[in-house]
Amino acid sequence: MDYSSMHQNVMGVSSCSTQDYQNQKKPLSATRPAPPEQSLRCPRCDSTNTKFCYYNNYSLSQPRYFCKSCRRYWTKGGILRNIPIGGAYRKHKRSSSATKSLRTTPEPTMTHDGKSFPTASFGYNNNNISNEQMELGLAYALLNKQPLGVSSHLGFGSSQSPMAMDGVYGTTSHQMENTGYAFGNGGGGMEQMATSDPNRVLWGFPWQMNMGGGSGHGHGHVDQIDSGREIWSSTVNYINTGALL
């Protein structure tokens, strides 16, 4: 077989296939309904400025149109719904009453109740504790050799355990007695110093020292009372500063 004849046969078969394919497509395009060319009047505003959009629910008997004047849709042969002009477009605005209530609602003000730190923080039924009473309680604990923070005068309740503050300060009761709260000789010198000047003034308040007699551990000096008073004044100031912070 000649190559030219084979080429002609192949070309003839391809042309027939293309013609058959085009013939099959023509009926489909012919059956597709064309949109109406004439502009219909809007049933709502009676305007001719309308256009065809699509077939509703893919049904050829329900063409859907759009009016450019009132910006609303309608379906030919359907029921007209009561749609406002603009295609049911509504702006989301806050009501005037809600806005007014927001404006009239007072904002909570941040005020300080004016309570001192011991009352506001602990408040164990001691509503009248002041800094002066706290200093008095510290002085009372100092003179009676009580551990700090366990005296009932401070508003925390009394405690009979001498180890109540040992875990906090890392010391034992024997060490506290030896140090004597910066007065020396385990408190024995305190009694002798009280006999030398029983009416010493501590923090602006007159105090009556214990008059039970000395223990024989040494002679006390008034300078030790002054130094102890300075030490405890700085301690109280440090506590008050920490409470305010």
UniProtKB/Swiss-Prot annotation:
Signal peptide: none annotated. Induction: By cytokinin in procambium. Zn(2+) binds at residues 42, 45, 67, 70. It is found in: Nucleus. Residues 15-41, 91-118 are annotated as: Disordered. One of its GO terms (cellular component) is nucleus. One of its GO terms (molecular function) is DNA-binding transcription factor activity. The PEAR proteins (e.g. DOF2.4, DOF5.1, DOF3.2, DOF1.1, DOF5.6 and DOF5.3) form a short-range concentration gradient that peaks at protophloem sieve elements (PSE). Keywords: DNA-binding, Metal-binding, Nucleus, Transcription, Transcription regulation, Zinc, Zinc-finger. One of its GO terms (biological process) is regulation of DNA-templated transcription. Residues 15-26, 96-108 have a biased composition (Polar residues). Disruption phenotype: The pear1 pear2 dof6 tmo6 quadruple mutant plants showed a uniform reduction in radial growth, associated with compromised symplastic trafficking. Pfam families: Zn_ribbon_Dof (PF02701). A zinc finger (Dof-type) spans 40-94. InterPro entries: Dof (IPR045174), Znf_Dof (IPR003851). Transcription factor that negatively affects seed germination and opposes TCP14 function in the regulation of a specific set of abscisic acid-related genes. The PEAR proteins (e.g. DOF2.4, DOF5.1, DOF3.2, DOF1.1, DOF5.6 and DOF5.3) activate gene expression that promotes radial growth of protophloem sieve elements. Interacts with TCP14. This is Dof zinc finger protein DOF3.2. It comes from Arabidopsis thaliana (Mouse-ear cress).
